[in-house]
């Protein structure tokens, strides 16, 4: 079996899936207390890194995704699959789990 080198550019989401780079979580509280990893809230904001071709409709046509690469999005807290690539955290989720585009 050949080794596969995973990078953001080699990840191609299928269907209506979206690949998101997770924004860094807060390292300190407002009072200046450093938080250990176990106490940090899971981030819900990230930047779209890759977009799938869209949902396949019953008639065989594709529904174009509403987000684009580079969009900053707010997504459901426990949605998707967490993936770590090159020290960065990503989440792969369905487009329906994206709640809003943040401007």
From Swiss-Prot:
Keyword Cytoplasm among UniProt keywords: yes
Any one Pfam family match given in the protein's UniProt record, by short name: Cpn10
PROSITE patterns in the record: CHAPERONINS_CPN10 (PS00681)
Family matches, as SMART domains: Cpn10
Family annotation (InterPro entries): Chaperonin_GroES, Chaperonin_GroES_sf, Chaprnonin_Cpn10_CS, GroES-like_sf
Localization terms from the record: Cytoplasm
Annotated protein name in UniProt: Co-chaperonin GroES
Gene transcribed to yield this protein: groES
């Amino acid at each position: 079996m050949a080794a596969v080198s995973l990078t953001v550019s080699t990840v191609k989401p299928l269907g209506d899936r979206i690949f998101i780079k997770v924004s860094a979580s807060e390292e300190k509280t407002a009072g200046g207390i450093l938080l250990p990893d176990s106490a940090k809230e899971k981030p819900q904001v990230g930047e779209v890194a890759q977009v799938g071709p869209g949902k396949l409709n019953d008639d065989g046509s594709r529904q174009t995704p509403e987000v684009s690469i580079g969009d900053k999005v707010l997504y459901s807290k426990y949605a998707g699959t967490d993936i770590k690539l090159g020290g960065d955290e990503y989440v792969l989720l369905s487009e329906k789990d994206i709640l809003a585009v943040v401007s």
